[in-house]
Regions:
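Immediate flanking context of iron-sulfur cluster ligation sites
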Residues: 42-59, 80-85
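Charge-rich, acidic-biased intrinsically disordered regions
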Residues: 76-84, 113-116
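Amphipathic alpha-helical segments within well-ordered protein domains
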Residues: 34-35, 52, 69-73, 87
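C-terminal structural segments of small proteins and small subunits
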Residues: 83-109
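Iron-sulfur (Fe-S) cluster-binding segments and ferredoxin-like electron-carrier domains
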Residues: 67-79, 105-108
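Short cysteine clusters
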Residues: 61-64
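Acidic, glycine/proline-rich low-complexity segments that act as flexible tails and inter-domain linkers
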Residues: 1-47, 99-116
Length: 116
């Protein structure tokens, strides 16, 4: 069965929000780290999100794929750019990473508007 990455991301958002109320220290600290690490600097947020997508493929994290495809699209990434990031994930992840490239393609097609 094909994963609904839009729904997966929404479910994770809800669960992470709950954790934010139950363990606010670690969750707030992580949120701050994420915000600072992903803001524009020498590298744009878009580039950083695509780097995170490639890493998500390597470590085999479907939830991470959902988050980083969504956020890369939000930052202006195009399908060709996202697919190049997927290729880097394949390079670095080898055989096991190849399975997650298919997951990434599904997520790209679900988050990216038609024709982009």
């Amino acid at each position: 069965m094909k994963t609904d990455y839009v729904e997966l991301r929404q479910t994770l958002e809800e669960r992470l929000a709950q954790l934010g109320t139950e363990i606010p220290g670690p969750m707030t600290g992580f949120a701050r780290l994420h915000k600072k690490a992903m803001e524009d600097g020498a590298l744009s947020r878009k580039v950083k999100e695509m780097m995170a997508l490639a890493i998500s493929i390597v470590v085999g994290c479907e939830g991470c794929i959902a988050y980083h495809v969504h956020d890369a699209v939000e930052a202006g990434a195009t399908r060709p750019e996202l697919l190049e990031a997927v290729g880097v994930g394949l390079l670095m992840g080898g055989g096991p990473g190849s399975i997650y490239t298919a997951h990434a393609l599904d997520a790209i097609e679900q988050f990216l508007p038609e024709g982009n």
